[in-house]
Amino acid sequence: MYAVVKTGGKQYKVAAGEKLKVEQIPADVGAEITLDQVLAVGAGDQLKVGAPLVSGAAVKATVISHGRHDKVHIFKMRRRKHYQKRQGHRQNYTELRIDSIVA
């Protein structure tokens, strides 16, 4: 069984037992959270698609850790104008373990 959930403005296809890195969620490590924005639920050849959400569906997950992704380097330059700008960015994330899918 799998589900498509929306969190942090992004969509993820998840199944029970998987680990997933999502945008940072303000929850303690070890806390159980419920992702209730379920867009679709599937099992085998059956697929239930919401309009826009599947009613009564939820995904239960446990927070494993919080962290930061690798640095992304941004470099801007204007040729012949002696303008250069360097910048770096590290995005925060929360790692989840998907416990169960309730459909």
From Swiss-Prot:
Entry GO MF terms: rRNA binding; structural constituent of ribosome
GO CC annotation: cytoplasm; ribonucleoprotein complex; ribosome
Pfam families: Ribosomal_L21p
Gene Ontology biological-process entries: translation
Function as written in the Swiss-Prot or TrEMBL entry: This protein binds to 23S rRNA in the presence of protein L20.
Family: Belongs to the bacterial ribosomal protein bL21 family.
PANTHER family, per the entry: 50S RIBOSOMAL PROTEIN L21, LARGE RIBOSOMAL SUBUNIT PROTEIN BL21M
Protein name stated in the entry: Large ribosomal subunit protein bL21
